């Protein structure tokens, strides 16, 4: 019986998996791959959209994190993933908040003991034995401290998981064949932005600038996963499940966070390969399957 491919995505907060990799997760899950998502915090510091759940926020009841467990569970189900996995267990590390916000000092993820956090992820990697691991680039995508910390922890854990000499961590060593950063590709973003019309937006939304600093030029991209109509629909449904944090527009072609900046909901999701050997590439020089070169068939886009 052929081996089932396994992919692991590591994210900082609930909703990050759907925003960054929703189409990719849905694509592989629908084709029978084992897909897991590790979330490092409960997202307690998130800014709540609207009035219905506003009293859950950190400055009021401080119950947002628990509520977002339900949102993440629903989102993952819509993407085809069974249940969330929280690094260290649900609530072990707290959302650190955006850079420059008040430091509440209660088990913040950025203050996590490196060996404990890395060890928790090593244990997951050695148990699940993923063929592909995905997390953020060194800047955490857009610079959120928890995203940066997720990058640091994941990078260290991928290295330690395959080390035969490091016996302090549980489980048998597992060398991750391919390790990617999730990135935002320039051409796809600009095309998605340009395609948005007033019918796609809510009245209070504004379009993002064209020169967002954390976008990657096409020549730096190593891989793209293009979600089909089912994967894109699953991504939209998953984003809608994160209703305290994300609003999906009337057409399903755009969404916005609490800052009311409209973002195109892209079916193309881009990656940079940072460890492992690339598989077949297309005429752009991009892989179209994160599993390319690993001997699996039927998973490309």
UniProtKB/Swiss-Prot annotation:
Keywords: Hydrolase, Metal-binding, Zinc. Transmembrane segments: none annotated. GO terms for biological process: mycothiol biosynthetic process. InterPro entries: GlcNAc_PI_deacetylase-related, LmbE-like_dom_sf, Mycothiol_biosynthesis_MshB. Its EC number is 3.5.1.103. One of its GO terms (molecular function) is N-acetylglucosaminylinositol deacetylase activity. Disulfide bonds: none annotated. It comes from the Bacteria. The keyword Cytoplasm does not apply. SUPFAM superfamilies: LmbE-like. Binds 1 zinc ion per subunit. It holds the Pfam family PIG-L. Its cofactor is Zn(2+). Zn(2+) binds at residues 13, 16, 147. It catalyses: 1D-myo-inositol 2-acetamido-2-deoxy-alpha-D-glucopyranoside + H2O = 1D-myo-inositol 2-amino-2-deoxy-alpha-D-glucopyranoside + acetate. PANTHER family: 1D-MYO-INOSITOL 2-ACETAMIDO-2-DEOXY-ALPHA-D-GLUCOPYRANOSIDE DEACETYLASE, N-ACETYLGLUCOSAMINYL-PHOSPHATIDYLINOSITOL DE-N-ACETYLASE-RELATED. Belongs to the MshB deacetylase family. NCBIfam families: mycothiol_MshB. Catalyzes the deacetylation of 1D-myo-inositol 2-acetamido-2-deoxy-alpha-D-glucopyranoside (GlcNAc-Ins) in the mycothiol biosynthesis pathway. This is 1D-myo-inositol 2-acetamido-2-deoxy-alpha-D-glucopyranoside deacetylase.
């Amino acid at each position: 019986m052929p081996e089932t491919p396994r992919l692991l995505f590591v994210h900082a907060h609930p909703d990050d998996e759907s925003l960054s990799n929703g189409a990719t997760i849905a694509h592989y899950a629908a084709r029978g791959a084992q897909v897991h998502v590790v979330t490092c915090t409960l997202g307690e510091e998130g800014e709540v959209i609207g009035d219905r759940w506003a009293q859950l926020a950190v400055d009021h009841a401080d119950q947002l994190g628990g509520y977002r467990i339900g949102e993440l569970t629903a989102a993952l189900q819509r993407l085809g993933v069974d249940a969330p996995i929280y690094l260290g267990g649900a609530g072990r590390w707290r959302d650190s908040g955006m850079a420059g916000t008040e430091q509440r000092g209660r088990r913040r993820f950025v203050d996590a003991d490196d060996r404990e956090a890395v060890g928790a992820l090593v244990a997951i990697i050695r148990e699940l034995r993923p063929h592909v691991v995905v997390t953020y680039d060194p800047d955490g995508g857009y610079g959120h401290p928890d995203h940066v910390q997720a990058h640091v922890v994941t990078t260290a854990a991928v290295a330690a998981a395959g080390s035969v000499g490091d016996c302090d961590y549980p489980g048998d060593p597992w060398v991750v064949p391919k390790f990617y950063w999730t990135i935002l590709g320039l051409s796809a973003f600009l095309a998605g932005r340009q395609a948005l019309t007033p019918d796609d937006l809510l009245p209070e939304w504004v379009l993002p600038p064209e020169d967002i600093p954390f976008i990657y030029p096409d020549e730096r991209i190593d891989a793209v996963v293009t979600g089909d109509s089912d994967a894109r629909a699953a991504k939209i449904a998953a984003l809608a499940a994160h209703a305290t944090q994300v609003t999906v527009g009337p057409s399903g072609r755009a969404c916005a966070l609490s800052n009311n900046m409209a973002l195109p909901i892209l079916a193309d999701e881009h990656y940079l390969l940072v460890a492992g050997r690339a598989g077949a590439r297309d005429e752009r020089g991009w892989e179209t399957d994160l599993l390319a070169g690993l001997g699996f068939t039927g998973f490309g886009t």
